[in-house]
A protein has these predicted regions:
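Active-site-adjacent loops and short helices of periplasmic peptidoglycan-processing enzymes
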Residues: 1-145, 154-155
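Penicillin-recognizing serine hydrolase domain
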Residues: 2-6, 105-255
Length: 255
């Protein structure tokens, strides 16, 4: 545990903090911020504004994205479901940008939505400046506690679990192969998925969640020196949750 500068283990329904270390310390978030993009897409589907079958069109701006991508050309159409696969499994910056522009009208406007949603969730020490985590690494920040609050909200979206726990997939009739870096998603019992990764100038993070029976735990492990340490600590923290805690209802007194 000494290797991670910041982590939180939280029960997803009550937001009870089970374990933490420097949970309120500001850290660079790297590609963690894609999870807010995914959440806003899921909530747009909840409102009926979009569906997994909705076709979105790639812009010149999306095409200009560097880093991980699914090679979208300007004017190319792709369903929201496939774009989400690109983001969740492949960490694709161009797919993330297409989703952001569809929901917000522009990436700048979408970033405003990211920050307002963070405030609604009680993420009071978090700032988003763009939608991918690739370009705004020095300016964007969060805390392990704030990150865990986002994970609690994401854990409600069962329609995303299959994508979050997929190891591999493909797009464009096999032209684009997607391979997740999140090894826990398809290995940890009860996993509801999420993400691990880094950014150009941030440490490694592991954002994980799992549900067994009627209890769900999420953990945000931030600012680690390497991916293996982040993943091992996330697994250890989830084990602590499932091995040591359960949800009970207080007894109802007899009249």
């Amino acid at each position: 545990e000494e290797y991670s500068r910041s982590y939180v283990l939280m029960e997803a329904e009550t937001h009870t903090v089970i374990r933490e270390n420097n949970g309120d310390k500001r850290v660079k978030m790297g590609s963690f911020n894609k999870l807010m993009t995914v959440l806003l897409a899921a909530e747009a589907m909840d409102r009926g504004e979009l569906s997994l079958e909705t076709e979105l069109v790639a812009s010149e701006h999306a095409n200009s994205m560097q880093g991980a991508q699914i090679w979208l050309m300007p004017g190319e159409k792709m369903t929201l479901g496939d774009l989400l696969k690109g983001v969740i499994i492949g960490n694709a910056n161009d797919a993330c940008c297409v989703i952001a522009e569809k929901i917000g009208g522009s990436e700048e406007k979408f970033t405003e939505l990211m920050n307002s949603r963070a405030a609604e969730l009680g993420m009071n020490d978090t700032l988003f400046t763009e939608c991918t985590g690739y370009y705004g690494d020095d300016a964007q920040y969060t805390t392990a506690h704030d990150a865990a609050l986002l994970l609690c909200e994401l854990s409600k979206h069962n329609e995303l679990t299959e994508m979050f726990t997929s190891r591999i997939d493909e797009l464009k009739s096999g032209e684009v192969q997607l391979v997740t870096t999140n090894r826990m998603g398809h290995r940890y019992k009860g996993s509801v998925g999420f993400k691990c990764g880094t950014g150009p100038s941030s440490g490694y993070f592991a954002a994980e969640g799992a549900r067994r029976d009627d209890i769900c735990f999420v953990t945000a492990v931030m600012d680690c020196p390497d991916e293996d340490i982040a993943m091992a600590l996330a697994r250890e923290l989830l084990d602590i949750g499932f091995d040591g805690y359960l949800i009970t209802s207080p007894p109802i007194p007899d009249d």
